[in-house]
């Protein structure tokens, strides 16, 4: 029976357990086989075991059954203890080994990494980032810590800005909506989402857009509306002010000359910028904020502070000449002098200023001030009075005499009395005022076409002004721009100089770029119209082919230019006009008159009349100055056809203006010149008394001129009679 049982049990371990269960009861000791001799692979299974006999029983049997049972239990325990150690050391074939595959990082994991938290973050910030990344699903998260900006941005102080990219417009709106709802329900905040469309509003707009597209498809046309109010691609969520996270500033740290009021903001403001990928690449908002942060950190970095002054002396008044150099940074911290701890010094400064204004003398006079710093301040204020008076004196001179007063050039400081006085006052002025007035002097010389003052010298002085971190007011920028763009056409030169040189234009563009970095609004008529005039021709021209340029002659007061150059100028003007329209730049009367002259010089009459009509569309009254400019321009042009068209169209237009324009002597003189050019036989027409508009206009012009002459004669007679009356 045991043989049959063993045949039925084909597993070696099972057979051992069965035999051990029977033998333990009979008292026979079983010698366990060595584990190392057991094959680790399964043998070929067959219906019967091999005939080879295995010695399973030992030759020595024990009579005591209890001892046998104990030995069996000990052997089994020892075998069980040795199994884990031996099994761990046994060989495992390659097809049974578990391969530890290194998981490659998911390509989207890099986009979903959370940015590192800044120093002293608010407690809500980490939870906010995890929700934006995991629950909403915004990618490429970026965090900018703008709490160090001083002065703070318009969004508020202690600002932290988060940037995230949505997968599409619909995902953008859904994410912003869920984010706002989560903030309201979880943290009881009141977020403000600028650019977010509500759920129902978005559905309505999408439904209407689909309906319009369907109707347009049936009509055989396409939708040309540039902005449907849906595809903005940008939502700015202002989370609001949360607790904690404000940067602690040491008490007493304040900029010199700072004046303000209000309470210090407690807490941190968090703003989340959600954008589509296209919009984020287009506006590159992160780079703009990083640049602002870097510039602010450079401005607010620790500079050498002026040391404390000694208390004012009680006896004696002394005056020490100023020894300010370009390396003195103590006066570049602020435009206003630093606040003194001793208020008595302020009183002495005020007294010295009054005495200086009343009794102004040469630089060697004594000034009753208490400290050297007060003396320096008084001298800077005195230079503010004297330097403008010097420029006023220079502006009242004739151009030739003014050029003589400016000496030989930039390095000349002693050849004339004007230069000696100017640089004496400049040495006593503060460095900021000295740099500004030096730029003003160079601009005046360049506008007077002084050969010793070049534009590259002016731009070099401007760069020194910028490097010194002096303020750049708008008036100074426009003055510098006028000097760099100053140009006088010379048609008689070979080749004719009709446009501003490209080197001067490059300097002007660099100036505008620096002004934009300083916060100037360059999308203004003051900048754009100056550039528009700079790229244009300064005299009347007409385009010819390059091969015919040398043989072309001056016709009708117009100089021939290459058609390639002419078309290049037109392209630049078209781009500038597009910028003016896109930025909705408000143009005034002077700007429109400049544009009209440019189009007239280039012979672009269609653009000329379009600009003329645009004046009234912009709500600007076309008064006498416009019509006087119009008729004088056509009289100078010498084209009888254009003059005739202008007369027939614009004379009735004058009377339809609100209020209407009537003839005076000046306007009548300009219209008379234009009529004489367009109608050489005007005298015959007047004698025939033809019922024509031109004849009636001619009569009105003659009457206006005669009335002016009669009024002038009466005034002379009255003055002559008053001159003969006896004095009271």
Swiss-Prot record:
| Organism superkingdom | Eukaryota
The primary gene name is ATP25
The alphabetized list of GO BP terms reads:
mitochondrial gene expression; mRNA stabilization
InterPro entries assigned to the protein according to its UniProt record, in alphabetical order: Atp25, NT_sf
Membrane topology designation: Peripheral membrane protein
Q: Where in the cell is it found?
A: Mitochondrion inner membrane
Q: Which residues pair up as cystines?
A: none
Biased composition of type Polar residues is found at 74-89
Keywords carried by this UniProt record? Membrane, Mitochondrion, Mitochondrion inner membrane, Transit peptide
Q: Which organism is it from?
A: Paracoccidioides lutzii (strain ATCC MYA-826 / Pb01)
Q: Which family does it belong to?
A: Belongs to the ATP25 family.
What PANTHER family has UniProt attached to this entry? ATPASE SYNTHESIS PROTEIN 25, MITOCHONDRIAL
| Entry's Gene Ontology cellular component terms | mitochondrial inner membrane
Task: Give the start-end ranges of region Disordered.
Answer: 65-89
The record's listing under Gene3D superfamilies reads: Beta Polymerase, domain 2
Which protein are we looking at?
Answer: ATPase synthesis protein 25, mitochondrial
What is this protein's function per UniProt?
Probable mitochondrial mRNA stabilization factor.
Q: Where is the transit peptide?
A: 1-29
């Amino acid at each position: 029976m045991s043989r049959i049982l063993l045949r039925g049990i084909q597993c070696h371990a099972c057979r051992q357990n069965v035999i051990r269960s029977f033998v333990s009861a009979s008292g026979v000791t079983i010698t366990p086989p060595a584990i190392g001799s057991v094959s680790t692979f399964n043998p070929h299974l067959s219906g019967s075991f091999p005939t080879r006999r295995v010695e399973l029983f030992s030759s020595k049997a024990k009579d005591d059954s209890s001892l046998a049972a104990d030995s069996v239990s000990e052997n089994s325990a020892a075998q069980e203890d040795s199994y884990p150690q031996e099994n761990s050391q046994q060989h495992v074939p390659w097809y049974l080994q578990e391969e530890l595959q290194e998981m490659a990082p998911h390509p989207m994991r890099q986009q979903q990494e959370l940015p590192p938290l800044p120093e002293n973050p608010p407690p809500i910030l980490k939870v906010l980032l995890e929700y934006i990344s995991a629950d909403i699903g915004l990618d490429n998260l970026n965090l900018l810590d703008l709490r160090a900006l001083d002065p703070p941005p318009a969004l508020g102080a202690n600002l932290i800005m988060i940037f995230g990219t949505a997968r599409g417009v619909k995902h953008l709106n859904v994410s912003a909506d869920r984010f706002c709802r989560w903030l309201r329900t979880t943290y009881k905040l009141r977020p403000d989402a600028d650019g977010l469309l509500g759920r129902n509003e978005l559905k309505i707009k999408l439904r209407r857009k689909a309906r319009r597209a369907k109707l347009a498809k049936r009509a055989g046309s396409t939708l040309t509306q540039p902005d449907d109010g849906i595809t903005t691609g940008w939502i700015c969520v202002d989370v609001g002010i949360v607790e904690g996270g404000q940067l602690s500033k040491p008490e007493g740290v304040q900029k010199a000359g700072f004046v303000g009021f209000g309470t210090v903001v407690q807490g941190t403001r968090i703003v989340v910028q959600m954008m589509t990928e296209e919009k984020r690449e287009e506006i590159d908002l992160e780079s703009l904020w990083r640049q602002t942060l870097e510039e602010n950190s450079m401005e607010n970095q620790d500079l050498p502070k002026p040391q404390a002054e000694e208390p004012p002396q009680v006896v004696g008044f002394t005056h020490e000449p100023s020894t300010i150099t370009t390396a003195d940074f103590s006066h570049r911290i602020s435009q206003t002098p630093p606040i003194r701890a001793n208020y008595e010094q302020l009183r002495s400064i005020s007294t010295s200023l009054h005495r200086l204004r009343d009794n102004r003398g040469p630089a060697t006079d004594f000034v009753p001030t208490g400290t050297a710093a007060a003396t320096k301040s008084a001298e800077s204020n005195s230079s503010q009075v004297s330097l403008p008076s010097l420029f006023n004196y220079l502006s009242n001179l004739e151009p030739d005499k003014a050029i003589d007063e400016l000496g030989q050039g930039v390095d000349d400081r002693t050849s004339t009395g004007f230069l000696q006085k100017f640089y004496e006052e400049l040495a006593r002025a503060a460095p900021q005022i000295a740099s500004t007035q030096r730029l003003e002097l160079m601009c005046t010389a360049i506008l007077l076409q002084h050969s010793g003052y070049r534009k590259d010298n002016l731009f070099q002085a401007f760069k020194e002004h910028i490097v010194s971190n002096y303020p750049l007011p708008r008036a100074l920028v426009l003055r510098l721009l006028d000097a760099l763009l100053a140009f006088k056409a010379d048609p008689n030169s070979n080749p004719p100089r009709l446009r501003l040189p490209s080197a001067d234009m490059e300097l002007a563009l660099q100036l505008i770029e620096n002004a934009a970095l300083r916060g100037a609004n360059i999308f203004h008529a003051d900048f754009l119209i100056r550039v528009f005039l700079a790229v244009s021709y300064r005299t009347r021209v007409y385009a010819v082919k390059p091969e015919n340029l040398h043989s072309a002659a001056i016709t009708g007061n117009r100089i021939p230019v290459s058609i390639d150059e002419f078309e290049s100028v037109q392209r630049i003007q078209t781009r500038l006009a597009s910028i003016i329209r896109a930025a909705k730049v408000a143009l005034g009367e002077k700007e429109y008159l400049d544009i009209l002259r440019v189009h007239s010089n280039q012979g672009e009459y269609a653009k000329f009349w379009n600009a003329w009509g645009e004046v009234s569309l912009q709500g600007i009254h076309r008064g006498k100055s416009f019509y006087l400019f119009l008729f004088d321009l056509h009289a100078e042009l010498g084209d009888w056809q254009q003059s005739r068209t202008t007369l027939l169209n614009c004379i009735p237009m004058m009377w339809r203006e609100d209020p209407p324009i009537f003839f005076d002597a000046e306007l009548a003189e300009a219209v008379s010149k234009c009529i004489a050019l367009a109608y050489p036989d005007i005298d015959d027409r007047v004698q025939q008394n033809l019922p024509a508009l031109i004849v009636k206009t001619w009569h009105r012009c003659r009457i206006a001129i005669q009335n002016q002459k009669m009024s002038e004669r009466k005034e002379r007679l009255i003055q002559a009679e008053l001159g003969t009356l006896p004095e009271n």
